[in-house]
């Protein structure tokens, strides 16, 4: 198999790990048992190589948020969840430098608690009163990234590791707008990162690498956890200007209700912690 990425994808160790995860996530055991069969995996590989393998349209679900609203997530079929989970882990492994050090989300060993602890330490070290910096939230980040940036991310993977049938499968899925709504009716609309799909985690981290690089180079402390951002330090004003400008260039924007300037004498909430 000359397809390096596909060969790594079908490594038996990855499938064992993914199937174990599937048990913990309550994926039906009959589906997982199918995937333990070498003939099943060989048939999947053959279909991918021939361009015949497709991820099924997801089902939508409404998940409540902290402010009482709901967000739409896209839930994949059981086998597709396993396939996409393996693909997501592999993408992180293949392209570690596409995730900037200031981006902390969806990575093994890094949780919200450790991010908030470090941010609290940086705030405590900041001298002076008044405005310390800001926190912000991207407006519908998972729903608003244009497809060209998703394609560019996959292009970078293939530029380094060679063309892959697995990347073809992912591209095809991200270009497919079909989904089933809560009433099981087939619908179509652009889903951007497809929040709920495992690969959305990798995409959410890597697509803002250039912005992460620019903001982390300013005077201050910058950290991002998916669509939540925090900047503490002297350049907070400049950082906000650059943030809004760069997002606008990518057809994205901040949620104005979630932009908050941080004061030395006032508590604030970040990633669920106060």
Predicted regions: what is each one?
Residues 1-44:
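Non-catalytic, polymerase-adjacent accessory regions of viral genome-replication enzymes
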Residues 268-274:
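Short, low-order "capping/linker" segments at domain edges
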Residues 106-114, 230-233, 262-267:
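Beta-rich nucleic-acid/ligand-interaction surfaces
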Residues 122-226, 230-246, 250-252, 256-263:
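Conserved polymerase palm-domain catalytic core
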Residues 69-100, 189-217:
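Conserved pre-motif C helix in the palm subdomain of viral-like polymerases
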Residues 84, 88-146:
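Active-site-proximal segment of RNA-dependent polymerases
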Residues 46-68, 167-183:
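Reverse-transcriptase-like RNA-dependent polymerase core
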């Amino acid at each position: 198999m000359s397809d390096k990425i596909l060969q790594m994808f079908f490594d038996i160790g990855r499938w064992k790990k993914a199937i174990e995860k599937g048990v913990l996530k309550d994926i039906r055991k009959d589906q997982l048992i199918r995937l333990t069969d070498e003939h099943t995996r060989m048939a999947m590989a053959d279909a991918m190589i021939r361009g015949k393998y497709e991820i099924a349209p997801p089902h939508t679900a409404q998940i409540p948020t902290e402010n009482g609203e709901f967000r739409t997530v896209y839930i994949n079929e059981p086998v597709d969840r396993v396939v996409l989970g393996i693909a997501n882990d592999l993408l992180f492994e293949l392209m570690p430098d596409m995730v900037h050090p200031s981006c902390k989300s969806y990575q093994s060993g890094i949780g919200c608690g450790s991010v908030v602890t470090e941010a609290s330490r940086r705030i405590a070290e900041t001298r002076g009163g008044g405005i310390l910096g800001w926190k912000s939230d991207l407006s519908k980040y998972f729903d608003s990234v244009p497809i060209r940036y998703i394609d560019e991310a996959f292009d970078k993977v293939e530029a380094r590791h060679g063309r892959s049938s697995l990347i073809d499968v992912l591209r095809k899925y991200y270009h497919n707008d079909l989904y089933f709504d809560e009433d099981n009716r087939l619908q179509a609309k652009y889903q951007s990162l497809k929040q709920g799909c495992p690969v959305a985690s990798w995409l959410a981290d890597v697509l803002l690498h250039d912005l992460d690089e620019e903001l982390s180079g300013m005077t201050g402390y910058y950290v991002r956890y998916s669509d939540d951002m925090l900047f503490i330090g002297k350049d907070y004003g400049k950082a906000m200007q650059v943030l809004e400008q760069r997002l606008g260039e990518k057809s994205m924007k901040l949620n104005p209700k979630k932009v908050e300037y941080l004061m030395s004498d006032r508590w604030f909430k970040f990633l669920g912690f106060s």
